[in-house]
């Protein structure tokens, strides 16, 4: 429903581009002369527009001057259009699009996309927005969908309000500026462009980017809608300048033809005298019918070349803009009343109807009094506006109050007059009865008509409710499809991640097997070393036994020697006493000599004992060093003990053997020293200090050799221990890594399991909401039946009231006294009755005509009622089919999900992928995930962007001279890449051209439904294409 109409002119703005390189090399002159902000002089003639932009104007200045306000208008419920017109290579595409991802060179379309969401985020949080976009081109006078290249020849239809729209065009729901730019990138890749002598990226079609915004206040349920058409027209071409030939020439013919049709439409609207405007001459003018003279606020850019080479084309473009400036549009807010507003309006009309019925009843009562011959006083008459109908009736039934002349007549004539009066009274009563019957019939027909209207209103409400339910179910169905697609994508990515993890696990298993093999080799080496050590220990045991036997023999010899020395020392005199005195003296001398020798030997033994003490002290130092080494060995053994107990036992045995070996070595050295002393004593029996020193040196050398062998053995053992410890550390690190990876995989599996449970809970919640919706529908149906019964009761009471009033009027007419006046009074009564009869006859005829008209209208109303009932049945059938389709899809998706779940349980768990795009509402006060200073986020640099390099070079110079604005800094992180010059003809195709968008507004209607029926059935999907 539209209201708040206001008339406005088309806003026309003129923009001149800089001279390009070819024009500079050719020596073309710069012909425009700018005067102020709204006028330009070409060839001495001034041209005035709403705004004129010189070549050094930046994209931001152009946007703030013309397009920023139209965003607010569209969000306020108006329709808007911005389109660029001009010669080829005049900068139209640069003005409308520019470089999409360059914050300084982006055009009107990407800036509008950013500004729409900035406004929405700052609005009331009770508002909810649904934004959908379409992108199509008019190529060779055929409408081609740029978001689905399979749709190459779409048709233009009209909705129930006779507003043109493109039927079957793909519509995408968006919720962020990035999504709008993605749609533009996708459409631009499919648009027709070519290379001409005047432009490297010449548009070969008219492109139209449509933004449809619907907003609803959640609290008041008030709904507004607005459409914004962003049109980039192809430029008019002169073949002699562009050098077009072949397919490019055919494109130029169609472009010039459609632009000529646009010029004819603007000329007809500018003159204002022609009753026919040729909108249907071109599909472009047909689509833009509302933008040119209709319900829209339109802004037109006329882009011009400043070169003297294009003087004629520039003047023609300026004249076109001046004609367009005189066109008047009537813009109105697209407001849809809520149920509460409809109810208030219905109550207001009901009160008005009630007041009118009361006035009619009073006027009928007053009229009946006048008809009965009563003179109603002015105090009892209806006054003011309420008595307008009674005054009209009174004017038609004047009362004759002329002279009172008394005339005497004969009794026969008197009787004749009385009979005539009775006859007339009888006719009057018959007419009154007939009038009452007709009035009752009229009331019945009016009541039936009111009932039909109420039924029609209720049917319309039910129809709208069913349509809303159907659209809601369709949106839920789309959301369910998106969710299932999301789950399928996540599960597919999960399967891929599982395969990757399986490969990694296999690699780790191979590495672990290699390490196990290496460890087995080390263990085998260690076992061989242990067997070698055991063999050496056995050899050492044999050697120790042999040394023990030698030492025992030496001990026995030493004891015998000591015994012999002792006995000889004691028994020698006894033996000598029985011999000769001389021999005794010799023996005594010999004994004394032996004593002295023994003394020297004892002295030497004492020296040797001192030397032995010193050796014991050195051995204790060595023992302490050995103890520290043994402590270090025990520490390493404690580390090795965690790996194997067997290694500890081996090391412990090794340590005991080393200690036994050291003690035996010390004992052997001591015994060898005593043996040496004994041999020296037996051989020489003379003091030999030099031999003692040699024995001492031999002992020290032997001790040093033992010490070096012991240190070498300790160093070898330390090296082996270090190698084993390093191997143990490496195995521990590998085991820890494998354990961490296993824990990570288990955590991912638990997370996916939780997500699956959440999805199941959400599905149960949706099922519960659907059941509650069905219950509410049944309750509403019962309430409607109750209201219908109450209305029937009121209707019956009204009939009884009308019959009672009619009866009372008849009784009051019968109770009136008969007039017994004279002949004059009788003549007056006769005249009065004749006039009344004539008036009643007229009223009767009028009532008969009204009755006939009502009878004629009754079949039409019944037909409309039947059509409404059939439409309601069709809607119910469509709703039922949609529910059945949704249930089938749900079962099929559930089966697919169960199958994939089984496959995932069979394999393993993975990571969840990114979500698919969902058509969701935009709520003010909730900013997107991207930073406010970087609303476009990180975008792919491969997006195709066609722009005029002249504007880029010229504005780069201008921007170097002037500081960048806040808006340019606002998008400092965005980027764009330009495309190299194309070949002579380029036609970009979409990779997934055969894919159908899930938000496509095509619906599977039954056969025979035309555009109007579709618009009534699906008002949310078939919106007006007004700009």
Swiss-Prot record:
InterPro entries: Kinesin-like_fam, Kinesin_motor_CS, Kinesin_motor_dom, Kinesin_motor_dom_sf, P-loop_NTPase. It is an enzyme of class 5 (isomerase). It comes from the Eukaryota. GO terms for biological process: anterograde axonal protein transport; anterograde dendritic transport of neurotransmitter receptor complex; vesicle-mediated transport. Its main location: cytoplasm. Its EC number is 5.6.1.3. Disruption phenotype: Death shortly after birth. Neuron-specific deletion within the first 3 weeks after birth is lethal in 75% of animals. Surviving animals show accumulation of neurofilament proteins in neuronal soma, age-dependent sensory neuron degeneration, loss of large caliber axons, and hind limb paralysis with a stronger effect on sensory neurons compared with motor neurons. Residues 907-1027 are annotated as: Globular. Residues 353-1027 are annotated as: Interaction with BICD2. Residues 271-361 are annotated as: Necessary for interaction with ZFYVE27. Keywords: Acetylation, ATP-binding, Coiled coil, Cytoplasm, Cytoskeleton, Hydrolase, Isomerase, Microtubule, Motor protein, Nucleotide-binding, Phosphoprotein. The keyword Phosphoprotein applies. Residues 9-327 form the Kinesin motor domain. It catalyses: ATP + H2O + a kinesin associated with a microtubule at position (n) = ADP + phosphate a kinesin associated with a microtubule at position (n+1, toward the plus end). SUPFAM superfamilies: P-loop containing nucleoside triphosphate hydrolases. SMART domains: KISc. The modification Phosphothreonine is found at residue 397. GO terms for cellular component: axon cytoplasm; ciliary rootlet; cytoplasm; dendrite cytoplasm; kinesin complex; microtubule; neuron projection; neuronal cell body. Composed of three structural domains: a large globular N-terminal domain which is responsible for the motor activity of kinesin (it hydrolyzes ATP and binds microtubule), a central alpha-helical coiled coil domain that mediates the heavy chain dimerization; and a small globular C-terminal domain which interacts with other proteins (such as the kinesin light chains), vesicles and membranous organelles. Oligomer composed of two heavy chains and two light chains. Interacts with GRIP1. Interacts with FMR1 (via C-terminus); this interaction is increased in a mGluR-dependent manner. Interacts with BORCS5. Interacts with ZFYVE27. Interacts with VAPA, VAPB, SURF4, RAB11A (GDP-bound form), RAB11B (GDP-bound form) and RTN3 in a ZFYVE27-dependent manner. Interacts with BICD2. Interacts with DTNB. Microtubule-dependent motor required for slow axonal transport of neurofilament proteins (NFH, NFM and NFL). Can induce formation of neurite-like membrane protrusions in non-neuronal cells in a ZFYVE27-dependent manner. The ZFYVE27-KIF5A complex contributes to the vesicular transport of VAPA, VAPB, SURF4, RAB11A, RAB11B and RTN3 proteins in neurons. Required for anterograde axonal transportation of MAPK8IP3/JIP3 which is essential for MAPK8IP3/JIP3 function in axon elongation. This is Kinesin heavy chain isoform 5A. It comes from Mus musculus. The gene is Kif5a.
């Amino acid at each position: 429903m539209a209201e708040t109409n206001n008339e406005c002119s088309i806003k026309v703005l003129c923009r001149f581009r800089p001279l390009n390189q070819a024009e500079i090399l050719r020596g073309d002159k710069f012909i425009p002369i700018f005067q102020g902000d709204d006028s330009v002089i070409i060839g001495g003639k001034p041209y005035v527009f709403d705004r004129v932009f010189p070549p050094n104007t930046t994209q931001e200045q152009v946007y703030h001057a013309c397009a920023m306000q139209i965003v607010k208008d569209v969000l306020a419920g108006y329709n808007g259009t911005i389109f660029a017109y001009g010669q080829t290579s005049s900068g139209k595409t640069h003005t409308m699009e520019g470089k999409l991802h360059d914050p300084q060179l982006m055009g009107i379309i990407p800036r509008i996309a950013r500004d729409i969401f900035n406004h929405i985020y700052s609005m009331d949080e009770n508002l909810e927005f649904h934004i959908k976009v379409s992108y199509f081109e008019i190529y060779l006078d055929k409408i081609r969908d740029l978001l689905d290249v399979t749709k190459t020849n779409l048709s233009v239809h009209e909705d129930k309000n006779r507003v043109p729209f493109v039927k079957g065009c793909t519509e995408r729901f968006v919720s962020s500026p990035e999504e709008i730019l993605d749609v533009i990138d996708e459409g631009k890749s499919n648009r027709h462009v070519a290379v001409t002598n005047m432009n490297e990226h010449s548009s070969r079609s008219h492109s139209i980017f449509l933004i449809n915004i619907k907003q609803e206040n959640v609290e008041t349920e008030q709904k507004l809608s607005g459409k914004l058409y962003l049109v980039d027209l192809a430029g008019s071409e002169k073949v002699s300048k562009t050098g077009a030939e072949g397919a490019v020439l055919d494109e130029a013919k169609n472009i010039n033809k459609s632009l000529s049709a646009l010029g004819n439409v603007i000329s007809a609207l500018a003159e204002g005298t022609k009753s026919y405007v040729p909108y249907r001459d071109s599909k472009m003018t047909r689509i833009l019918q509302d933008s040119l003279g209709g319900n829209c606020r339109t802004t037109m850019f006329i882009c011009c070349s400043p070169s003297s080479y294009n003087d004629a084309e520039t003047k023609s473009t300026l004249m076109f803009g001046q004609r367009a400036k005189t066109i008047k549009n009537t813009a109105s807010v697209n407001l849809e009343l809520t149920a509460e507003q409809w109810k208030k309006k219905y109550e207001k009309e009901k009160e008005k109807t009630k007041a009118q019925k009361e006035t009619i009843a009073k006027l009928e009562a007053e009229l009946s009094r006048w008809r009965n011959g009563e003179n109603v006083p002015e105090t009892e008459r209806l006054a003011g506006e309420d008595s307008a109908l009674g005054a009209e009736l009174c004017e038609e039934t004047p009362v004759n109050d002329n002279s009172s002349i008394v005339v005497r007549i004969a009794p026969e004539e008197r009787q004749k007059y009385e009979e005539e009066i009775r006859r007339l009274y009888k006719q009057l009563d018959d007419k009154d009865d007939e009038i009452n019957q007709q009035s009752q019939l009229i009331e019945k027909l009016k009541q039936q008509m009111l009932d039909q209207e109420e039924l029609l209103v209720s049917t319309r409400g039910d129809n709208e409710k069913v349509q809303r339910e159907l659209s809601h179910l369709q949106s839920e169905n789309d959301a369910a499809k998106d969710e299932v697609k999301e789950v399928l994508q996540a599960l597919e990515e999960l399967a891929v991640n599982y395969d990757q993890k399986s490969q990694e696990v296999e690699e780790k298993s191979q590495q672990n097997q290699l390490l196990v093999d290496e460890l087995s080799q080390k263990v085998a080496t260690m076992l061989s070393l242990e067997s070698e050590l055991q063999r050496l220990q056995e050899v050492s045991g044999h050697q120790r036994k042999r040394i023990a036997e030698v030492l025992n023999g030496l001990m026995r010899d030493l004891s015998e020697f000591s015994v012999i020395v002792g006995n000889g020392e004691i028994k020698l005199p006894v033996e000598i006493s029985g011999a000769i005195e001389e021999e005794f003296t010799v023996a005594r001398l010999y004994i004394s000599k032996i004593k002295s020798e023994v003394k020297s030997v004892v002295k030497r033994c004492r020296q040797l004992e001192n030397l032995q003490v010193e050796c014991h002290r050195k051995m204790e130092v060595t023992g302490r060093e050995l103890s520290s080494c043994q402590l270090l060995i025990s520490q390493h053994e404690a580390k090795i003990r965690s790996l194997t107990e067997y290694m500890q036992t081996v090391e412990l045995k090794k340590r005991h053997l080393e200690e036994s070996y050291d003690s035996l070595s010390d004992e052997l050295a001591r015994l060898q020293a005593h043996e040496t002393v004994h041999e020296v004593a037996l051989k020489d029996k003379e003091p030999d200090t030099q031999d003692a020193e040699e024995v001492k040196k031999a002992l020290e050398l032997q001790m040093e050799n033992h010490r070096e062998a012991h240190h070498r053995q300790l160093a070898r053992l330390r090296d082996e221990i270090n190698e084993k410890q390093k191997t143990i550390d490496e195995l521990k690190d590998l085991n820890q890594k494998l354990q961490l990876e296993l824990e990570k995989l288990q955590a991912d599996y638990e997370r996916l399991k939780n997500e699956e449970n959440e999805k199941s809970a959400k599905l149960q919640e949706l099922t519960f909401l659907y059941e509650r919706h069905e219950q509410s529908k049944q309750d509403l149906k019962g309430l409607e039946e109750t209201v219908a019964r109450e209305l029937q009761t009121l209707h019956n009471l009204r009939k009884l009231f009308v019959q009672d009033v009619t009866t009372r009027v008849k009784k009051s007419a019968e109770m009136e006294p008969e007039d017994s006046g004279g002949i004059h009074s009788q003549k007056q009564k006769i005249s009065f009755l004749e006039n009344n009869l004539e008036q009643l006859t007229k009223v009767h005829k009028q009532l008969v005509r009204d009755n006939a008209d009502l009878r004629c209208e009754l079949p039409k109303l019944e037909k409309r009622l039947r059509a409404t009932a059939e439409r309601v049945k069709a809607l119910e059938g469509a709703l039922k089919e949609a529910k059945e389709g949704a249930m089938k899809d749900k079962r099929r998706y559930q089966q697919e999900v169960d199958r994939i779940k089984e496959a995932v349980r069979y394999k393993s768990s993975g990571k969840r992928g990114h979500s698919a795009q969902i058509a969701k509402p935009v709520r003010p006060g909730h900013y997107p995930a991207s930073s406010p200073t970087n609303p476009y986020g990180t975008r792919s640099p491969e997006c195709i962007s066609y722009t005029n390099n002249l504007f880029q070079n010229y504005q780069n110079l201008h921007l170097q001279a002037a500081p960048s604005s806040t808006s340019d800094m606002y998008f400092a992180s965005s980027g764009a890449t330009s495309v190299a010059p194309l070949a002579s003809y380029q036609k970009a195709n979409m990779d997934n051209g055969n894919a159908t968008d899930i938000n496509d507004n095509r619906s599977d209607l039954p056969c025979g439904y035309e555009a109007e029926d579709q618009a009534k059935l699906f008002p949310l999907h078939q919106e007006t294409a007004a700009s």
